[in-house]
């Protein structure tokens, strides 16, 4: 059974406790709005509730991410001025919709190659728990495509925990952070519908969980 540890805490603080190159692959989906800008933050709905994006991360986030991981995939890299050669273009298959972008770009670090890839995975779904939730199938594709280079996966802002579910199903050790307590709890509930891992609070204490297969 693979390791699956998640932390309800700030990811930068967590990364600062780790040695260099601790993870084989980091997959990040950072918010891209800045509350210091005059423009209002973008709002999105999940199951009828309105949520706001968090602030765009500071440079220290990207510096730490590259320090603690050997390879990086960063969604929305084109919004952060990050130079990259290879990228993933995710076609969300939302034809005729002007509400959100139809294609999303993720940079891939040079260590993963400079070949750009195009993938079609539907983002349709009624039970989303996070405004920027990505489908498990997308993360399955990422791990299947780049899995020969990795054993451990890190998601610093895991949100809905799609990346965690994919890593568990593919047998990779996984570590993740989520600062928002509500998203953290909802993500854990979602994860537990399929698998069983270890949840730790910011102080390191373990939250006991019930395995779905206990008693069956």
Q: Which positions does each model-derived feature cover?
A:
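Class I S-adenosyl-L-methionine-dependent methyltransferase catalytic core
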Residues: 1-154, 160-216
């Amino acid at each position: 059974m693979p390791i699956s540890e998640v932390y309800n805490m700030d990811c930068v603080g967590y990364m600062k406790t780790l040695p260099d190159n601790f993870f084989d692959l980091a997959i990040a989906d950072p918010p891209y709005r800045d509350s210091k800008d005059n423009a209002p933050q973008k709002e999105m709905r999940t199951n009828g509730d309105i949520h706001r994006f968090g602030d765009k991360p500071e440079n220290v986030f990207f510096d730490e991410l590259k320090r603690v991981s050997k390879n990086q995939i960063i969604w929305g890299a084109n919004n952060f001025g990050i130079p990259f050669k290879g990228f993933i273009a995710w076609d969300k298959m939302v034809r005729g919709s002007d509400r959100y972008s139809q294609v999303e770009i993720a940079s891939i670090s040079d260590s993963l190659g400079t070949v750009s890839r195009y993938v079609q995975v539907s983002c349709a779904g009624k039970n989303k728990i996070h405004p920027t939730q990505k489908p498990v199938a997308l993360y399955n594709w990422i791990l299947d495509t780049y899995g020969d280079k990795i054993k451990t996966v890190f998601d610093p802002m895991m949100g809905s925990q799609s990346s965690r579910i994919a890593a568990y199903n593919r047998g990779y050790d996984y570590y993740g952070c989520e600062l928002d307590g509500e998203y953290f709890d909802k993500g854990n509930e979602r994860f537990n519908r399929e698998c069983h891992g270890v949840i730790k609070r910011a102080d390191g204490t373990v939250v006991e969980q019930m395995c779905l297969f206990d008693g069956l």
